[in-house]
């Protein structure tokens, strides 16, 4: 019986959650409540690729100490599950994180994320689209993943395709790319990932430019979902991008 069967949850979710729980239980005086964690996991090799923790901390805290505390917790959790500890460690990659909670982020987001996307047919990372500008990968990378999946089908590389892009705060390139063609693909998964990295600029700036996300009227996406309508640039593969950027729904 593997870890996922024992926990009835995805292993990366278990690792990330238990890391946060451990930090809460240890009650480090340097750390404050706002904390998030993310694990990029290679299911094929059964190993952790990247472990991220971003935690709020006291104004007086030394960031080196914060990183040591979090890295130790990462190693502890990975070892408890018999997993590798030579993964990429990311702790507060954007730097100091003093102001947190609703004082740092506010807005009505997260309302119907499944209805906004694929109705449960595809995996969803949990980040909402609406209420965020396209510099947030919750929005831009979701649209880009959709576009890439459509391109895979359009080029005849597969009959079905799901693209997953995983990002870490403060890192512009995705820390993980996963391609699932449900046994319909013509290319090995590793080759598909290399093709994606070579073909597309997956930084926030690159995706914004490629899809013309500064020119989209997002009011239209507030109803009937964020996909399926051909005038949206991540859906429209027949118009040149210059035209798609300025197309509006009739």
At which residue positions do the language-model features occur?
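Short beta-strand elements
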Residues: 1, 37-58, 101-122, 165, ...
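Glycine-rich, mobile lid/loop segments that gate access to catalytic sites or pores
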Residues: 1-99, 223, 227-238, 242-245
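Alpha-helical support elements that line or immediately flank enzyme active sites
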Residues: 4-24, 132-156
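Short, intrinsically disordered, mixed-charge
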Residues: 21, 25, 75, 120, ...
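Structural beta-strand/beta-sheet cores of well-ordered domains, especially the beta-sheet scaffolds
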Residues: 35-37, 49-51, 85-89, 93-95, ...
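ATP-dependent carboxylate activation and anion-phosphoryl transfer catalytic cores
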Residues: 54-61, 86, 93, 97-100, ...
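Glycine-rich anion/phosphate-binding loop at the beta-strand->alpha-helix junction
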Residues: 62-153
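Internal helix-turn-beta structural module
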Residues: 160, 164-250
């Amino acid at each position: 019986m593997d870890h996922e069967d024992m926990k009835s949850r995805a292993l990366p979710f278990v690792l990330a959650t238990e890391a946060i729980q451990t930090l809460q239980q240890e009650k480090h005086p340097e750390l404050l409540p706002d904390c998030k964690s993310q694990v990029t996991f290679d299911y094929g090799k059964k190993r952790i690729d990247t472990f991220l923790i971003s935690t709020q901390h006291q104004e007086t805290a030394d960031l080196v100490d914060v990183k040591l505390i979090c890295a130790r917790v990462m190693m502890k959790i990975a070892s408890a599950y018999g997993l590798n500890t030579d993964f990429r460690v990311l702790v507060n990659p954007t730097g100091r994180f003093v102001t947190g909670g609703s004082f740092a982020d506010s807005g009505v987001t997260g309302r119907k994320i499944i209805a906004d996307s694929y109705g449960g047919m595809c995996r969803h990372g949990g980040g909402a689209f609406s209420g965020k500008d396209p510099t947030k990968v919750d929005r831009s990378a979701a649209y880009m993943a959709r576009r890439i999946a459509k391109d895979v089908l359009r080029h005849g590389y597969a009959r079905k395709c799901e693209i997953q892009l995983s990002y870490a705060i403060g890192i512009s390139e995705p820390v993980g790319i996963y391609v699932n063609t449900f046994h319909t693909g013509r290319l090995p998964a590793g080759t598909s990932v290399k093709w994606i990295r070579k073909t597309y600029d997956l930084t926030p700036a690159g995706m914004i430019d490629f899809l013309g996300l500064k020119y989209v009227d997002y009011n239209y996406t507030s109803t009937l979902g964020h996909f399926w309508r051909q005038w949206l640039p991540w859906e429209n593969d027949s118009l040149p991008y210059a035209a798609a950027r300025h197309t509006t729904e009739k």
